[in-house]
């Protein structure tokens, strides 16, 4: 079974500061993905977090650079000017993201969790300049989710989310139903900075899917987009 449930215990804070934490789950759709000739059938899929009112303090800093790769079949080096021109982009076609949970292919449930800290994602071209890049969505709880997601009893405290394109305080990009309830904020609430699609709760929710929010009150301190210097 590739689908796992995490139950948080104890009385302290799960402080990820300085740990090099880069999110749980893979960065791309795990269901049928492949990267060149490398199959990705057995990637971790965390589908439930039972927070038990515990606090997770995030500290994620991801910088994606243009690179040279070697084609597996021809053996020749390929210059990749921009990350979104990646030769095997089909592996990232559905959802991809960075967050506490990076990408969720399957239905995702998170409840009774307190979240604080910072996530920062920036992409750079061959000249070392940051640019707007839609390859990775960024969200406080989940970067990209392909199935339905249900969040309840979430508290956001001084949470800062920076992304290269699609960014949301809770969810970067969703292609399915969203149900949010009993979500609140404390202190400064939520700061969100994105390259383009940016929202206090959700950066992008695809047309035609259910989007329900109830019994929630959140202080969204700032939502800002196209500020690549952040």
Task: Specify the residue positions occupied by each region the protein language model found.
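Surface-exposed repetitive/solenoidal architectures
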Residues: 1-230
């Amino acid at each position: 079974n590739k689908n796992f449930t995490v139950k948080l215990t104890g009385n302290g804070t799960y402080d990820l500061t300085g740990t090099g934490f880069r999110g749980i789950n893979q960065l791309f759709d795990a269901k049928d993905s492949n990267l060149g000739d490398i199959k990705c059938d057995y990637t971790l899929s965390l589908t439930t977090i039972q927070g038990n009112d515990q606090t997770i303090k995030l500290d994620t800093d991801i910088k994606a650079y243009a690179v040279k790769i070697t084609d597996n079949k021809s053996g020749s080096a390929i210059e990749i000017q921009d990350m979104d021109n990646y030769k095997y982009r089909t592996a990232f076609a559905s959802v991809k993201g960075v967050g506490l949970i990076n990408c969720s292919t399957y239905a995702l449930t998170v409840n009774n969790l307190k979240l604080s800290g910072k996530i920062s994602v920036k992409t750079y071209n061959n000249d070392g300049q940051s640019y707007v890049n839609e390859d990775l969505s960024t969200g406080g709880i989940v970067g990209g989710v392909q199935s339905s997601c249900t969040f309840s009893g979430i508290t956001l405290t001084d949470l800062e989310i920076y992304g290269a394109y699609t960014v949301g305080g809770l969810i970067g990009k969703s292609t399915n139903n969203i149900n949010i309830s009993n979500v609140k904020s404390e202190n400064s609430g939520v700061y969100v900075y994105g390259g383009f699609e940016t929202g206090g709760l959700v950066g992008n929710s695809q047309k035609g899917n259910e989007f329900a929010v109830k019994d929630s009150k959140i202080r969204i301190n700032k939502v800002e987009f196209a500020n690549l210097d952040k």
